[in-house]
Structures are given as structure tokens and as C-alpha cells.
Amino acid sequence: MIDTIIPSTPRSAARAVTADELAAADAVALETPYLFGRRQPDTTRAERGRRAVTMSAVVAHRFGPVMTHSMRNRRLSTDDWVPALRRTFEDLGTTFLKFGQLVGSAPGIFGDDVADEFRSCLDTGPPVPFDEVKRLIEDELGRSLEDAYAHFDPNPIGRASIAVVHRATTHDGAEVAVKVLRPDVERRVAVDLDLLQPLLAKVVEATGEQAAVSMLQQFDGFRQQLGEELDLRNEARAMVHFYRLLGLVDLPKVTVPEVYPELSNRGVLTMEFIEGVPVDDLATIDGYGADAPIVVQQVVQAFLLTALRWGTFHGDVHAGNLLFRPDGRIGVIDWGIVGRLDADTHLLFRRMIEAALGDDTAWADIAAIFMRHYGEAIEAALNLDDDGLIAFIKMMIQPVLTAPFGQVSLADMMLAPQRAVAAASGIDADDTSPLTRLRRLNEQRKARKLVVTQGAVATDFDRATFLLSKQLMYFERYGKMYMSDV
């Protein structure tokens, strides 16, 4: 049993969570919050048609020059289609921008160059008139804005593609943040999703590249994630759940905003306002005078505890969602995405950590999990038997296990076998020899077949590994900032 998530060092604030604390937290963890599953509304032909006209014009504008160039060069290169797709997403906004953000945050899945290109996609949106915000809140809460809040700032403190956030004060004097879904956002997202999937399928057919296939494979999980985000009761329940859970283990530097259920509903979420700066704002944090490495280490410990022991975790821990507070604590905000590990991903993560702690028996389990999910690809690309696979996985993963935390890449550790398989069967994009052209055409045919026959849908294991590895990459960055010597 992994009781101490991060081994203690002379200056470490990491601590062994006691058996009593774990027992109490286990009871709460079993009460995983019910999700209000929201199926996107059915869209009309007219809605799809209007949006398709806009999308077609944007695609023609962005991909026209690219296709002309590819016809001259007899191939569509990554340097051509990736920037064109990113600009297309930026022009179309809303759902497309959110998908672009997903690509930009996952170099382990899409490759460093592709992720770098999409990193400029910012999830933002236009202002919502205050009268409209007021109407939305009053419709959701069934009372006037003045009855709900003593003061409500009409100027938003945050504007994303699906919601806006305002600051307010309750009649009890509490400072709160109020998240409000944009008007008609569900229908706009539903129409976009109906058109995004065919667009990604066309990109796969045109390029045959693994990065394009990976985008299409992540679409189903993206659709599911948006369905959860469009009902703020899901986020409220997740916050209450983790607030209780982390309150039972002694990690005092980690805080979750308190939810005000009487001021929350499907389209409105009222929560404690957290004053702070993003965890990567080193200059401001240094001025707070807190021992930042100790604080960040407890956040990492909290994340690993929830993911390793209970298989659930915050699914979007970018720096803006980890607010370093002036009092030396970190507030973890924006619980719209919560990761839930399927049984195999949960076991894989635990066994990898146990392998890192010296359990040699873990490698056979790790190899067996990868064989279950990637057996055919491993056999075709690497031609390894069971013993060879175990040795290969150890060779890929073991070097990172003895490095200081700030130099460890847990995400690379999770994704190493998949990357190696892809590399072993990959094609040099810069090679224009006749043989390589033939191989590229063959890969394109395989990609088209995947789209037509299977829909290129990722498994629960793929999606869970993807979401977990994304968060680990963020924590690696914070580790390099604050704990490179731990």
C-alpha cells in the first residue's frame, strides 16, 4: 500500500497520511458524486447548414493554399496542414478553440511540434451583456439578482468560451465567484460537435498522419467532457466531494473552494472567491514570503493521493487553476473536468509508482496491461515476446525512476511504450523517396480504413491515460520550477 505519496526529505512538507485518515477518506471516496449526464440537444438541419456554410468558407480560406502547395509537392506535410487546422479552429471559435486547447496541452499524444502549434489557442469568448447575465441567473435560481446577492459586479473577472465568471457578495458578507453558462451555449456546442468530427475525419483521410488520427480518437472523450461541463451541477458536486475528501487528510496547504448550493443550479455555480495568482507567477509568489516548494509539494501529494488511491483527480491543473494565495496556501479551482481512471489505467499508474519504489514484480503487470491494449501493434512494430516486452518497458521507463522529482517525467513514463510503438512503425515526413511515398500512401489507406470501419474511437484506457498524462505534464513543469532538488 502506498501510504506516503512523496518520500520525505529534510526540508519536505510531505507526510505519511495516517491509517485513520485514509480510512475516513476511503469512506468518502466511495461516494463518488453522481454525474448529471447531459446529452447534447439534437440539432436541426438548418442550424447545421448555417454553421457548415461558415465552416466551409473558413476551411477553403485556410486549406486552399495548403492543398495547392501539396498538389505541387505531391504530399500534404505536417508543416502545411497543422498550422492551417489551428487557424481554422481559431477562426471558428467556441468548441473548435476548446479542442485546439486540448491538442496544445498534450505533446505526449500529438507530438511536440503539433502541440506547440496549437498552444496559442486561448479559450476565451466575447462579453455577455450584463442584462443577459442577470436574466440567466434569475431564471436558474428562481429569484431576483438582488435577493440572491447583496452585491454583484457587472464586469466579469473571467470569460471563457462556454461560461463567464463574475465576482459577488452574499447577504452574509461572503466574497464569492459566480460562474454562469453563456446563453444558448448548449445548442452552439452541439452544432459544432456535429461538424467537428467530420472535419477531423477529412484531415485523417487527407494526411494519414498519426497526429490527425489521435485528434479523431480523442473526439469522443472531448464530446463527453463537454457534456459534463455544460451542467454546472457536475462541477459543484465534484468540488463538494474533493472538499470533503481533502479535509480528511492533513494537507493544510491545499484548499478547494466552498460551494453555495442554495445559489447554484444547472447553469449557475456560486463558490468561495479565491484570491491568488497562478502558481507559475514566481515573482509575485516570492513576495508572499511563503516556502513555495513546500506548498507545491503538498499539492502534488494531494493529486497523487486522489489518483493513486481513489482513481479520481482534477482533470485540468494548468497554472491558472492553481492559485497561490497570499496566506501561503494554494486554491485549486475550476473542477469542470474530473478524471476517472478505468480499472486498467488505475492499476497501471499504481504499479508504475510501485515499480519506482523498487517492486520488481510490478513490471509483469505493467507489460500485461500494455499487451491487453496494444498487443497487435507491439507485435507488429517491435516483434517482441512476453519476456522481451517486459525488458523493453523496463528499458523505456526505469531511467526516470531514480531522478530527482523535478527531473522526473511521469507522463513520459506512462506514454513511453505507446510512443515507442509509434516510432517503430513511423515514417520520416521529410523523406520523399519513392519507397517512402509508397509507405505513406499505405499508411493513409490504413488511416482511412480506421475511420470508415472503426470510427477511430479511443478506448476508456486511451482516454484515461491521455487525461492523466496531461496533468502529470503540468506537475512536471511545477516540479522543475520549485522542486528540482527534491
Residue ranges of model-derived segments:
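Residue immediately N-terminal to the catalytic "proton-acceptor" Asp
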Residues: 168, 310, 315-320
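Helix-rich C-lobe and terminal helical cap/extension of kinase-like folds
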Residues: 18, 34-49, 73-75, 79-80, ...
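Glycine-rich ATP phosphate-binding loop
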Residues: 167, 175-182
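Conserved ATP phosphate-binding architecture of protein kinases
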Residues: 163-171
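ATP-dependent phospho-/nucleotidyl transfer catalytic cores
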Residues: 119-126, 138, 186-191, 197, ...
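Core structural elements
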Residues: 91, 95, 159-162, 262-273, ...
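Residue-level signature of catalytic and energy-coupling elements of molecular machines
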Residues: 100, 165, 178, 235, ...
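N-terminal accessory/targeting segments that precede structured cores
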Residues: 1-164, 187-217, 223, 425, ...
